Amino acid sequence: MSIELSRRDFIGTCSAAACSVSLGMAEASGLYPGGGYTGTLCLFSKPLPGMGWRQLAQAAKSVGFGGIDLTVRRGGHVQPERATEDLPKAVEAIREEGLDVPMITTEVTSADDPAARPILSTAAKLSIPFFKPGYYQYKMINVRRELESAASQFRGLVALSKQYGMQAGYHNHEEYIGAPVWDIASVMDMLDSKWAGFYFDARHAVAEGGVGGWKIAVNLVMPRLKMVAAKDFLWQKTETGWAARNCPLGEGMVDWKYFVNALAAGGFQGPISLHLEYDVVGEAGAAREENIVAALQRDLQFLKTRLREGYGAIAGER
C-alpha cells in the first residue's frame, strides 16, 4: 500500500489541519484563564491629523479609548525628524490626560534609516513597548529575491530595536510583503519572538485570504502576536470590477465573533488599535472631526461588545 502524497494533497491536508485547529480556538469562547481582556484599546491617530496631542487624547478618552497608537511618520502627529524633541512632549500630553501610548506607527524599514535610531531610542526611554515598522514591496520580478531583500532589512531593524528594548510588530497589509502572512512568517521564524512578531490585521487578512486562508493566518500568527489592528471592509462592484471598500466595524466581511474568540483562546492581551479608514460624511474642520469621533465611538462600542463576548469581560469596566 502506497503512502505517498502528491504536493497538492499534502498542502491540502496541512491546510485542513490548520483550519481545524484555528476553528477550535475560535469556537472555544471564554476559555482564556485570565477571565477578561486586559490590554489597551487604542485610537490610531491617523484619522484626526488636525488635532494636537492633548486634544487628541481628550477626544479619545471621551469616547472610551484607553490609549493612543501614535503616528510617528511623515504627515503624522510626530514628524520623524523631530522625534527626539516632539515624541516626549506628545507622550507627556497624552499621559497627562490619563491615556497610555503602548505603540507607535512608523515608516522605518531599515536600521540604516536616519530616523530609526532617534525614534526607537526615544520611544524606549518613554517606556513604549511596541512599534509598527514600514512596509516592503514586491516588484513582481523575482518575489523570492524581493522577499529575501526585505528580510535582510527587517532582520537588521529588529537587531537595532532589540538594542533599545523595543518590540517590532509587522503589519500584514494587502499588496505588500506580508499580505498573505506566510511569506513574512518564514522571516519571523528565524528571529527571537521576544523582539519580532505580528501586528495582525483581520481586514487585510480576509481580503487576501477569502474563506479559509485568513483563519489559517490567525492560527499562524498567534504564538507571536504583538498587536492587533481593528478595521473592516466589503467587496463592492464598480465599473472596472470588484474593489475592496473600507466600512464600519461589523458591516463588512470580517467574522468578528470568530476572530475575537480566537484571540481570547490564544491568550492575546496586547494593544488593539482601532482604525478608521472609511469616508465619514459631513462638514469640514471641527464639525468633520466631531463626525469622525462619533464614528470612532460607534466602532469602539462594537469592538467592546465583541471583546466582552469573546473574553468574558474587559478589565476596568463595571
Give the ranges of each region predicted by the language model:
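Conserved, mostly hydrophobic/aromatic
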Residues: 60, 68, 94, 123, ...
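C-terminal segment of N-terminal export signals and the immediately downstream linker at the start
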Residues: 24-59
